[in-house]
C-alpha cells in the first residue's frame, strides 16, 4: 500500500469483522453491513506530530474512530479510510 495522508490526516485499514460473537452467535450478513469503527493506522500525515515531537498516534496503533467521519478509499483491493486526526476517538492499548 502506498498512501501518504496530508496535513493532520491518518490512513486507517479497517479491522476484519468477526463472523460470530464471543458467545458463539453467528452474525448474519445484514449485521455486518454496519460500518466498522475500528482499524489500524497505516500512515500518518506530517501535521499529526505536535511541536514537542510526541505524536498522539503512530503507524500500527489500533484506533476507534467516529462512525460517520472520513473518506473511504480502496487501494489494491483493500479498504481504507482517510480520517482527520480529530476523528480518532481513542487508541486501543493491549
Swiss-Prot record:
Gene Ontology biological process terms in this record: chaperone cofactor-dependent protein refolding
GO MF term list: ATP binding; metal ion binding; protein folding chaperone; protein-folding chaperone binding; unfolded protein binding
Localization, UniProt: Cytoplasm
Record's keyword terms, sorted: Chaperone, Cytoplasm
PROSITE patterns, A to Z: CHAPERONINS_CPN10
Keyword Plastid found: no
Main location per the UniProt record: cytoplasm
InterPro entries named among the record's database cross-references: Chaperonin_GroES, Chaperonin_GroES_sf, Chaprnonin_Cpn10_CS, GroES-like_sf
Pfam families in the record: Cpn10
A GO cellular component annotation in the UniProt record: cytoplasm
Biological role stated in the UniProt entry: Together with the chaperonin GroEL, plays an essential role in assisting protein folding. The GroEL-GroES system forms a nano-cage that allows encapsulation of the non-native substrate proteins and provides a physical environment optimized to promote and accelerate protein folding. GroES binds to the apical surface of the GroEL ring, thereby capping the opening of the GroEL channel.
Complex formation: Heptamer of 7 subunits arranged in a ring. Interacts with the chaperonin GroEL.
Similarity-based family: Belongs to the GroES chaperonin family.
Name assigned to this protein: Co-chaperonin GroES
Organism of origin: Halothermothrix orenii (strain H 168 / OCM 544 / DSM 9562)
Taxonomic placement: Bacteria, Bacillati, Bacillota, Clostridia, Halanaerobiales
Amino acid at each position: 500500500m502506498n498512501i501518504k495522508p496530508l496535513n493532520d490526516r491518518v490512513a486507517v485499514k479497517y479491522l476484519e469483522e468477526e463472523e460470530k460473537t464471543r458467545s458463539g452467535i453467528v452474525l448474519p450478513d445484514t449485521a455486518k453491513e454496519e460500518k466498522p469503527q475500528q482499524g489500524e493506522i497505516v500512515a500518518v500525515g506530517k501535521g499529526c506530530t505536535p511541536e514537542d515531537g510526541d505524536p498522539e498516534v503512530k503507524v500500527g496503533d489500533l484506533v476507534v474512530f467516529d462512525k460517520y467521519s472520513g473518506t473511504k478509499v480502496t487501494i489494491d483491493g483493500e479498504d481504507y479510510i482517510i480520517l482527520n486526526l480529530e476523528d480518532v476517538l481513542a487508541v486501543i492499548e493491549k
